[in-house]
């Protein structure tokens, strides 16, 4: 029998992994992020097919899987990084499947000779998993020619190239500084196969995220409160330091506090379950954003 006649069962292989479950969960748990989700699906498909090819003795260089996540604050970069490590583990691409989040200070030392051991220590801990470098652009300080950041980048580059079967590196940060960072470090940029951009959420998406967050904590918006929250989000979006889903999360924490306060002030009443669950419009409208 020629080797071309050998076959594998895609469905069987697919079922062996938990990948379908993870992709579905990803879809359900994360609102919006359509381009991000489709890239993840593509990566998962590539890895699965690669595995099948290997089973049949068709070899291909293992695809580089280093990634770049760019986007505004609170758009889900860290959250997706965690899911990504799950997926890569399920597909057998990484052996341990943990995610280690670091920033510049974990990699770069203050004094001469301190950076290399620091960076190597971090890389050792991350082996078999995902190294998530948050605010990666801080690694490179062009104004300071004695900066030890470039030493860390050198070591990182070598490992990204030579040990790509054992480690996936994700560089994350806000779009503009990351673009500048890559311009100054083309070697790094070109070793990253997947540049994924996280779009800002629309008001509708943020409302949907709010409802999911509340549901998780067994709270509910009244119809009026939902109107108020929609107005709140539209206003908050235009203010400085807006951080997408994180701003919404913080706003909901404050609304819960106001709800508790409101109920507390009405002491003496017998409380119903509904009253304890409901967030009312006034719990939202008391925000200073409406002043
Ligand atoms: N699409 C989404 N659906 C539901 N919840 C989300 C979504 N995106 C983000 N969140 C929630 O919003 C919060 C902030 O997300 P996350 O920390 O992943 O953002 P980030 O992009 O890493 O932000 P930063 O750039 O500031 O580090 C988390 O609590 C996360 O669960
Ligand atoms: Mg983050």
UniProtKB/Swiss-Prot annotation:
Its main location: plastid. NCBIfam families: cbbX_cfxQ. Belongs to the CbxX/CfxQ family. One of its GO terms (molecular function) is ATP hydrolysis activity. Necessary for the expression of RuBisCO. ATP binds at residues 71-78. It holds the Pfam family AAA. Gene3D superfamilies: 1.10.8.60, P-loop containing nucleotide triphosphate hydrolases. Keywords: ATP-binding, Chloroplast, Nucleotide-binding, Plastid. It is found in: Plastid, Chloroplast. This is Protein CfxQ homolog. One of its GO terms (cellular component) is chloroplast.
């Amino acid at each position: 029998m020629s080797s071309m006649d050998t076959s594998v069962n895609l469905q069987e292989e697919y079922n062996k992994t938990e990948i379908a479950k993870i992709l579905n969960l990803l879809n359900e748990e994360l609102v919006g992020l359509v381009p991000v989700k489709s890239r993840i699906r593509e990566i998962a498909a590539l890895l699965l097919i690669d595995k099948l090819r290997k089973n049949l003795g068709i070899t291909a260089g293992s695809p580089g899987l280093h990634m770049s996540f760019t986007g505004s604050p609170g758009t889900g970069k860290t959250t997706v990084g965690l899911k990504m490590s799950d997926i890569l583990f399920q597909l057998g691409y990484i052996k341990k499947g943990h995610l280690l989040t670091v920033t510049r200070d974990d990699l770069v030392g203050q004094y001469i000779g301190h950076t290399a051991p620091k960076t190597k220590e971090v890389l050792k801990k991350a082996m078999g998993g995902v190294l998530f470098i948050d605010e990666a652009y801080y690694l490179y300080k062009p104004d300071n020619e004695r900066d030890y950041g470039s030493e860390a980048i050198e070591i990182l580059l070598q490992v990204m190239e030579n040990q790509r079967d054992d480690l996936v590196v994700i560089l994350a940060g806000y779009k503009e500084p990351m673009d500048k960072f890559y311009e100054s470090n083309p070697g790094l940029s070109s070793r990253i196969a997947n540049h994924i951009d996280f779009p800002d959420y629309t008001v509708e998406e943020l409302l949907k995220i709010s409802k999911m967050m509340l549901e998780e904590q067994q709270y509910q918006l009244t119809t009026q409160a939902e109107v108020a929250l929609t107005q709140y989000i539209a206003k908050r979006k235009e203010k400085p330091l807006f951080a997408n889903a994180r701003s919404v999360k913080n706003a909901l924490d404050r609304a819960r506090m106001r709800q508790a306060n409101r109920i507390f002030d009405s002491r003496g009443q017998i409380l119903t379950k509904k009253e304890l669950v409901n967030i009312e419009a006034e719990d939202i409208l008391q925000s200073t954003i409406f002043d």
